[in-house]
Amino acid sequence: MVLTAGDKANVKTVWSKVGSHLEDYGSETLERLFVVYPSTKTYFPHFDLHHDSPQVRAHGKKVLSALGEAVNHIDDIPGALSKLSDLHAQNLRVDPVNFKLLNLCFVVVVGRHHPTILTPEVHVSLDKFLSAVAQNLTSKYR
């Protein structure tokens, strides 16, 4: 999926709001994921999955930091996510559908905290970007 110049600008606008809240928004995204899609909990058997768990907060920050890397390298998402793609495909073996579910939860979190910036056009751009991220994270699956 090709991101237009407008899409890239929209994603960067969203990230200008999100980037200073990585731990909070990341943890909220994961908590929402675990509640709405309980099967995703199976990848975290060693985590305390309760609200505001330090493990969920730390992992949420890590997830959104990786998204931030993709935003910062929006013209080379495959290069920015290559090592993470290897990790998920070869070691963690996360079912690819879970990236799409995470993306849905992240968009809800963005909309909840920044409803005025999540216009239909921005929503489409963010969805295209997140789809590109998910596609790249699963590109090394066999």
UniProtKB/Swiss-Prot annotation:
GO terms for biological process: hydrogen peroxide catabolic process. O2 binds at residue 59. Residues 2-142 form the Globin domain. Pfam families: Globin (PF00042). One of its GO terms (molecular function) is heme binding. CDD domains: Hb-alpha-like (cd08927). GO terms for cellular component: blood microparticle; haptoglobin-hemoglobin complex; hemoglobin complex. It comes from the Eukaryota. Red blood cells. Heme b binds at residue 88. PANTHER family: HEMOGLOBIN FAMILY MEMBER, HEMOGLOBIN SUBUNIT ALPHA. Involved in oxygen transport from the lung to the various peripheral tissues. Belongs to the globin family. Hemoglobin A is the major, and hemoglobin D the minor hemoglobin of this species. Tetramer of alpha-1, alpha-2 and two identical beta chains. This is Hemoglobin A subunit alpha-2.
